[in-house]
Amino acid sequence: MSLSVDGVTVRFGATTALSGVTLSVGRPALLGLVGPNGAGKTTLLDAIGGLARPEAGTIHLDGTALTRLAPDAVARLGVARTFQSPRIFTRMTVEENVRAGRGVDPGPWLAATGLEERRRDLASALGPAEARRLELARALAGEPRLLLLDEPCGGLNATETEAMAALLAGSAAPGRAVILVEHKLRVIGRLCERVAVLHLGEKIFDGPPADLHADPRVLEAYLGRARAS
């Protein structure tokens, strides 16, 4: 799997959400994508997944152009997505959520995400952390080539975050790449060998997490000023 984002610009009216962003991801890989609020992280996932139409630039998955495809067409190419607010079918059971539209055996995916004992419960009865795990199980059940995760640890406490991080560690299976948007930098540092930073719609850093705190552009983005060296 090879994802190539080349010079992508996305505008919403007078607002430039992404400006000339270039990024490449191979497999297996778990790429962290971070940045302050409003940096363009979710918009980049939307552009890859067909939910936002770039004004300029191209996006290719294994040589296939994604830029003009609808979300369902992108999904058929092997791209799966989770969202900041989990999108699950609340009137269906947990196992029905995983099986829906796929015809797969939900058992292995529920076991992998710690939801096996709740398989017959309605999804509406799940707590926030369980809902996030269910959405991840749904995404993984399609055995995607590219997995886009938008703040899967958002709103979770320390114990729940540790449990989710353990699940995410195994998400970049052979033949799959993962782009992980996450505000909790300790999760990024633990899971990712590479991290890209967006600020005001532009990519300002791309490298190992250990180098984040030494980069003046990253410090400027997060602190509003460059830290003296």
Identify the residue ranges that each predicted region occupies.
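Glycine-rich phosphate-binding loops of nucleotide-dependent enzymes
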Residues: S2-S229
